A protein has these predicted regions:
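Glycine-rich, acidic/polar active-site loops that bind/position phosphate-bearing ligands
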Residues: 1-185
Length: 185
């Protein structure tokens, strides 16, 4: 992702994965907001194997996976402007002081009839549980998909406003949670 939290990525075939894991994948960092200047374009995305996950909503035949990457400079150093690297550096600083940083976010979002109008898909209010409601089923499917990807969910419920829902993720270390949040996006 970029410094603004926008997801970035590219696709490779499974045959290219061993090469990507050892050498990384070259890309032009100058085109990503907040990364580098035009004269510092070469960057390498090196996959972190611990983040490998199959995307459960894709067909099982010729499955598709996602994996997060660390961004390295041409000389093999971690790129200072990579948000993931910034978090890793700060986790190490906290660890040296004897702290472990755990995070347990509440993801709040709305369901709308379409992407053009802000008309809520339901008229529920706080903690409403309507078993046959479309949004309750959508939220349930989201929770099951997150758990299938290894992201533990503690609870979920309808929030205060019509169409507003919340999913509470179970606490974990900051880096894992940052990756989990990007997966949720």
């Amino acid at each position: 992702n970029d410094i603004l939290g926008n997801l970035k990525g590219f696709a490779i075939n499974s045959e290219e994965l061993p090469n990507a894991l050892t050498r990384g994948m070259n890309f032009d960092g100058s085109t990503i907001q907040g990364f580098t200047r035009n004269n510092e374009t070469d960057m390498y995305a090196v996959p972190d194997p611990s983040t490998f996950a199959i995307l459960p909503w894709r067909p099982k035949t010729n499955a598709v996976a996602r994996i997060f990457c660390n961004i390295l400079t041409p000389d093999g150093n971690f790129f200072e402007g990579d948000p993931r690297n910034i978090l890793i550096r700060n986790i190490k600083k906290a660890s040296k002081l004897g702290y472990t940083y755990y995070v347990a976010p509440e993801l709040e979002y709305f369901y709308f009839h379409n992407s053009l109008e802000a008309e809520p898909l339901d008229q529920g209010t706080y903690f409403d549980q309507i078993s046959n409601d479309t949004t309750t089923n959508l939220r349930r499917e989201t929770v099951l998909t997150l758990e299938e990807m290894g992201i533990p969910v503690e609870a979920s419920h309808h929030e205060v406003a019509p169409g507003q829902h919340e999913i509470n993720l179970r606490h974990t270390d900051a880096l894992t949670m940052a990756d989990n949040i990007l997966t949720c996006k």
